Design a protein with these regions (language model features):
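C-terminal structured subdomain/cap of oxidoreductase catalytic cores
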Residues: 1-2, 9-12, 18-30, 76-81, ...
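A glycine-rich dinucleotide-binding beta-alpha-beta segment and adjacent secondary-structure elements
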Residues: 118-171
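Short, low-complexity, polar/charged sequence segments that are solvent-exposed and flexible
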Residues: 39-44, 94-102, 146-149
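Flavin (FAD/FMN)-binding glycine-rich loop and adjacent Rossmann-like elements that form
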Residues: 49, 53-54, 63, 67, ...
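Conserved FAD/dinucleotide-binding core of flavoprotein oxidoreductases
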Residues: 24, 70-111
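Mid-domain catalytic core of redox enzymes
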Residues: 1-70
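Flavin-binding catalytic cores
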Residues: 28-29, 70, 97-136
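Composition- and surface-driven signal marking solvent-exposed, interaction-prone regions
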Residues: 35-37, 73, 90-92, 128-129
Length: 171
């Protein structure tokens, strides 16, 4: 790959990643719902990531029960998360990120569950186990540079800059 093409790709901005809290639900405590629920505390969709506030937007989604029952076994909570919130641990490896990283994930999970309780009252008491992932998790398992959820950020004002041809000359 030509160096100029590689530099161009490297200079393009990626989209946000997300923080995910996957919750294993206690048996027969939450009935299955066949839709995603979006929760927004504030309408500022363009600048929210610049603020250092608790989680204020959330996607609540549940899997179809594998056992065919009417009760949920897992609920996933997703909220946008920028790379900058994890950058302090970018040099670390999976499972070796330290207590501050674990504390940050626990705090984020608590904020997500608390916000989700607006839609599912009593969710805290329904959780048997929880697992979390951050942009670092996505980076390490999917090899996206900053754990990006949707790849390169597109610019409708200048679409040509983010258009990458699938055919490039091989030197």
């Amino acid at each position: 790959m030509k160096l100029t093409y590689r530099n161009r790709i490297g200079s393009l901005e990626n989209t946000f990643s997300s923080f995910t809290a996957s919750l294993r639900i206690k048996p027969q405590t939450l009935r299955y719902f066949n839709w995603n629920q979006y929760i927004y505390l504030e309408p500022n969709v363009w600048t929210f990531y610049q603020e250092n506030k608790p989680v204020s937007r959330l996607l609540v989604s549940c899997r179809v029960p594998e056992d065919g029952s009417e009760y949920v076994q897992q609920v996933d909570l997703l909220t946008p998360m920028t790379w900058e919130k994890c950058e302090a641990w970018s040099h670390t490896k999976v499972g070796r990120r330290g207590d501050r990283y674990k504390e940050m994930k626990e705090r984020m999970a608590e904020e997500c569950i608390t916000l989700a309780e607006r839609f599912i009252p009593g969710l805290h008491n329904m959780v048997a186990e929880r697992y979390t992932s951050t942009p670092l998790t996505y980076r390490d398992y999917t090899l996206t540079p900053t754990g990006s959820a949707y790849g390169l950020r597109k610019d409708f004002n200048n679409p040509i800059t983010t258009m990458l041809s699938p055919r490039t000359p091989i030197p």
